[in-house]
């Protein structure tokens, strides 16, 4: 909400360091809590590799500790849905090993579409030149972006206006997925 209200405010993200992951994983190791970590997609961030490095260091110090780092393959709300279902699976009695396997298999069923309000984040992240974001903003360009089971983003189409972008998303969904409602 603060990003919408203050157009001058720019948020940036950075990958979590292996050291930070190590600290968190070590708390679970010391407590003896088997852990499954659903990580942001490797296709979009180096966080997954940092978590794997930390997991390897933890396993050297705590060889009996059960720790599984799973690439959730899902940016945005799909990651939240996967995490919520993982909690249900864990509560139904899955072991950490079984839960990691379930999560690794389940994320291949996730696929999503979205559009952006502005192109500024793409320019700030170096995905498009700032001039393209500026011109695109003036022309009310809205990209239709999808992500696949590996979490990789791809441009599906470019629309003029949010309504057209949302219609394109709905049409792509109808064209590519069968559903019973």
Labelled PLM ranges:
Residues 1, 43, 47, 51-57, ...:
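Mixed-charge interfacial surface used for oligomerization/domain docking
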Residues 1-20:
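N-terminal glycine-rich anion-binding loop in soluble enzyme alpha/beta folds
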Residues 13, 17, 35, 95, ...:
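Residue-identity detector for threonine
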Residues 12, 37, 69:
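Short catalytic-loop micro-motif centered on adjacent basic/acidic residues
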Residues 18-28, 53-57, 169:
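Short, charged beta->alpha transition segments
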Residues 20-48:
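N-terminal glycine-rich phosphate/adenylate-binding segment common to multiple enzyme folds
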């Amino acid at each position: 909400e603060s990003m919408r209200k203050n157009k001058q405010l720019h948020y940036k993200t950075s990958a979590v360091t292996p050291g930070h992951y190590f600290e968190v994983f070590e708390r679970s190791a010391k407590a003896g809590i088997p852990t499954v970590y659903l990580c942001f997609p490797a296709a979009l961030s180096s966080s997954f590799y940092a978590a794997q490095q930390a997991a390897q260091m933890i396993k050297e110090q705590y060889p009996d500790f059960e720790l599984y780092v799973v690439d959730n393959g899902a940016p945005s709300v799909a990651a939240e849905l996967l995490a919520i279902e993982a909690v249900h699976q864990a509560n139904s009695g899955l072991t950490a090993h079984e839960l990691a396997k379930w999560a690794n298999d389940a994320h291949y069923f996730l696929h999503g579409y979205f559009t952006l309000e502005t192109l500024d984040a793409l320019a700030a992240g170096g995905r498009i030149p700032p001039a393209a974001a500026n011109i695109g903003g003036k022309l009310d360009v809205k990209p239709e972006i999808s992500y696949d089971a590996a979490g990789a983003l791809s441009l599906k189409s470019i629309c003029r206006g949010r309504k057209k972008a949302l219609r394109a998303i709905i049409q792509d969904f109808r064209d590519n997925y069968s559903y019973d409602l």
